[in-house]
Amino acid sequence: MKALLAKILYGLAFAVALPALLLLWAQALDAKYPALSRIGSWQAGVPLVLTGAALILRATWDLWQLGGGLPMNAFPPKRHVAHGLYGWLPHPIYVGFAFIMLGGFIVLRRPAGVWIVSPVLWIGTTALVVGYERLALRRLFGDSLPRPRLALPPSVPEPPRWWHRAAAYVLVFGPWLVAYEGIARLLRSQTGGETYLTIELGWRPVEWTVALYAGAYAWVTLAPLAATSQATLRQFIRDGWVGSAFIFWCFLVFPLSATPRPFGATNWLGHLLELDRVRDTAFCAFPSFHVFWPFLAARLWAGRLPAVVSYGLATLMAASCVTTGMHSLVDVLAGFGVFVAVNRLDDGWRALLRQTERVANSWRDWRVGRVRIINHGGYVGAAAAGGLWLVGILTGESHAGEIMVVAFCGLFGAGIWAQWLESSSGLSRPFGYYGGIFGGCLGALIVQFWRGDGWLLFGAFAAASPLIQGMGRLRCLVQGCCHGRPCPDTFGIRYRQPLSRVCKMAHWAGQTVYPTPLYSIIGNGIIQGLVLRLWTLGAPLGLVAGAYLILSACARFMEEGYRGEPQTVRFGGLAIYQWLALLFVIAGAVSMVLRGPSAPPIEPLTFLPLLYALPFGLLVWFAMGVDFPESNRRFSRLA
C-alpha cells in the first residue's frame, strides 16, 4: 500500500504539480519582464501540444506493456524497453513534455514561458538525463543497451542506413533551426558593434554570387545523404552539435553585428537575397554559420567527390558571404576557425586531457619549520583576488566594505559547511562550494540591512562566481578533490601523486578517472559569458543571480553524476550535491521573479579594487594552501 501511494504521489508531482508550477513561474515572469517578445499563435502551439501528448501516451504504453512499469525514475520498469517508440527515439517522454509546455506557452501567450521557462526546462531535462538517468539505466540493465534508430549512429565503417541519415535531420538540423530562429527573434532589437573593417565598407556586392550563397543551403541539407559510413555521419552530427552550441553562445555573449551592406537587386537572385535579409538579423553573424556548415558538409561530400572539389566549393560559398555583402571578413574567418576547431576536436580533447593530467600531478610543497606551503593554494588565492577585482569593477569603487563582508562570509561559510559535511581525521580543514554560496548569501543579506545594497552585491558575486569557481578548480585538480570515478582510458586522466585525495582516500592511484574538475572549468566558462552579458544589458539583478544559480546547478548536477569521492553522502539514488542543485534551481527561479534593482553600467577598468582583492587573495591562499601536517589539532591539516 505504501509503495502504491508513493507511486501515485510521484506521478502527481511530475504530471500535475510540475507543469502547474512552470505555468505559475511563467506568469510571474511575464509580470516582471513585460518587454519580452510576444509569441502567440494557436496554429503553432496546438500541434506541438498534440504531438507531445501523443509521444507521452505512446511511450508510457510501451513502458507498461514491454517494460512492466511506468515512467518513474524512482520506480523504474523491470525490463529495459528498446522497441516501440523507444526503438526509434531516445527519451520520447521528455521530448513530448518539452513540446507540450512550449506549445502551451505559445497558445496561452506567455512570452516568458517561451524565452525563459522552456529553455530552463530543456537544460534541466538534459541535466537529469546526463547526470542521472543515463547512468542509472546502465547500472540496472548493463552497458550494452540497444541504440534507438534516431540516435547517434555507431562509430563503424559500414554504410549508413536510411534512419542513420534521418537522425542527422532530427538531431541536428531540426534543433538548429529552432534555436537559430529563436535567437534571431530574441536579438532582433539589440544593438552592437559592427564587425566590418573600414576597407570593406566600400566594396560593392556582386549579384551573381548569390547563387553560391543560396546554394549553400542545398549543399548542407543534402550532405547527410552523401555520408559513406556510419562513423563519418556520427562525427558530422557530433561536430554539428559542438560547433552550433559554440556559435550560438557567441551570438548571445558578444554584442557584435554585421548589418548587410547595401544591395541593389536587379534579378530574381538579388530579390531572393533581399528576402533572406528581411527574415534574418545582423546579430546572428559572428561567427558565420554560412561558413561553418558548408565546410562541415564538405567533409561528408569529400567521400563522394574529390576533396579539392568538395572543399573548393565550400570555399566559394564562404567567399560569397563577403561578395554578397551579408557578412564581414571577421565573421567569415571566425566561422572557418570554428570549423577548424571542431574538425580537430578529438585531437584537441586529448591534448586538453594531457594538460589536465599534468596539472593533477603537479603537487609541490615546501616546509618552513612545522609549516607546509602547498602550491595549489596559489590557484585559489588568484581566483579569490580575481573574483573580488571583478566584483569591484561591477559595483563601483564605493562598495569596498560591503564586498569584504560578503567575501568573508563566503570564506567562513565554505569552511563551516565542509566541516559539517566532509570533516574526517585525515581531512581536518576542507572547504565546500555550497557553503561558500550560503555564506555569501548571508553576507548579502547583512549588507542589505546595513547599507541597502544587498541586491547589488548578490548579483555582482553571482556574476563573478564562475570565474572564482573555474580558477579554483585548478586547486581541486592538484589536491585531488572533486575527482571523478573510474572510466575507460580514452575518457579520463590518471592521478599518481601519493598525497592526492584520489590516491590517499579513494585508493585509485594510476587508474583512469573522469576529469570532473575540467568539466566544471568548461561549464563555468560558458556560464561566465552569459551572466556577464546579462549584466552589460542592464538586466535586473535578480535575473543575473537567478541565471547563475540555475545554470550552475544544472552543470553541477551533471558533473556530480561522474564524480567518485568516497566521502560524498548519497540518499534517494542521488548525491547530496545533486539534491542541493535541485534546491538551487528553485532558488534561481524565485530570484528571477523578486523585485530588485537592475545591474548598473560597468565602469571603466580600474585597479583600485585590487587594494582589497589582493590581501583577501593572500588570506584565501593561506587558508587553502598552508597547513601544519604534524599537528592533530582541528583545522591544522589540508591533506
Residue ranges and their predicted role:
Residues M1-H83, V95-P154:
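Membrane-anchoring alpha-helices and their flanking helix-loop junctions
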Residues L18-A28, F173-G192, A383-L390, M592:
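Alpha-helical transmembrane segments of multi-pass membrane proteins
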Residues W208, Y213-A218, L222, T356-A639:
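Hydrophobic, membrane-interfacing alpha helices
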Residues M1, V156-W219, F263:
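N-terminal transmembrane-helix/juxtamembrane module of multi-pass inner/ER membrane proteins
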Residues F14, L18, W42-L55, P159-R185, ...:
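N-terminal signal-anchor transmembrane alpha helix
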Residues L63-G68, R188, G192, A227-V308, ...:
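Membrane-interface loops
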Residues A74-G87, I93, P146-P148, L197-L201, ...:
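Active-site-proximal inter-transmembrane loops
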Residues G96-L108, L222-L225, V291-S310, G337-D346, ...:
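Membrane-interfacial alpha-helical segments at the cytosolic side of multi-pass membrane proteins
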